[in-house]
Amino acid sequence: IFKSGIKTNSGETPGLEGAEFTIKLNSAVERAYSQGYTYAEVWNGIDENGNQVKVDSKRVQSAQAIAPSYAVIVTDKDGNAYTKNNLPYGKYIVKETKTPTDYETAVDFTFSITEDESEIKEIAKKTKHIVVNNEQLETYIKLIKRDLKTNKLVTLNSTTFEIKATKDIYDRATKKILFKKGETISQKIGNTTYTSFTTNADNIVVPDNSFNSKNDDKATITTPLKLPVGSYEITEIKVPSGFLQLEEAVKFEIKNVKDYETDKDGDFVKEVIIKNEQPTGTINLDKTISIRENVDTSLIDTSDLSGIEFKLSAKENIIDMSDGSVIYEKGQEIKKYNLTKDGKLEITNLPIGTYEIEETKTLNGLVLNTTKYEVKFEQKDLTTKVYTEKLDISNDTTLVEFSKTDITGDK
């Protein structure tokens, strides 16, 4: 048996090392099936697709007694495998029982020995040559965009990705370089060559030479063609609105393709998830007490301002840029906060948007500050993670006027 590892339309058939073939008499295999033994039991725990599956060892042993293996042969570095002994007359079935990693397993095939060896005079005719081709396994890449913190799918706005080779990508049969290290992966469909891939979304912007399909789920894009085994990385050339750029490329490797999920057509699909972060806002509030002149402060304890309370509300709808959902509705109270003992307040992890903060409680002897302070966070670039707004708020002491009245009611 000569075993080759081919790539579709490459025209090359170099030998493939390490493929194992098991040879059984076809009539014996059919007899085992007729007695109720399954395919995997007959082939020692290997199913029709070449996968190892769980089987009852006793039934396997019984099936092997009915349909024993006449030979188990393994291809050498040149792709050749030979039976050690001559096979007697008959029709045989051959199964590839071990396949080199990331090659498709060949389908079962049969051959016949139709002449008795003793009647064959020419030595060359005593060897039956069989060529078996294995297709190199490749996979589609499904890129999935998610929010780093919430893990939500980013469906509101599209993302555009590039895929690059992080090492030279070879045709494993011919050893020819398909993509050089650092090269951007391009895929040609018809007359168009695509060099990037754009996710489906509610709002889609597709750059020139970028592939997009309305048939893909939102927040995803699947490459139109398969990629070969190798090492790759993903970068973003268009970041979705409301998100930060990736801090580093997302690396992935294509290997052990048979472990990947398959689509409805049985093609392998490798999922790669890319997560980005949304910027946030932080409010730093510093509270001071303004002491009026000629005011008795003996009843005012300014050593502990933790009794002062503030309320934070949304001044507009606060939107989650992952999917466009409303996090806080306009006018909605978000939370009430008390100051620290020394009059400070820090509110963190606020989604980008516009807020109002107002004082709702103060200390005895202080005037309640009724001003509503607007705090607005706007994303200005793709790298700033936290936008900080500082508020310095002051309270006046209460001014109380006392009057004295005599017993007659006169002042």
Question: Where do the PLM segments sit?
Answer:
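Solvent-exposed loop/turn and edge beta-strand elements of beta-rich ligand-binding domains
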Residues: 1-411
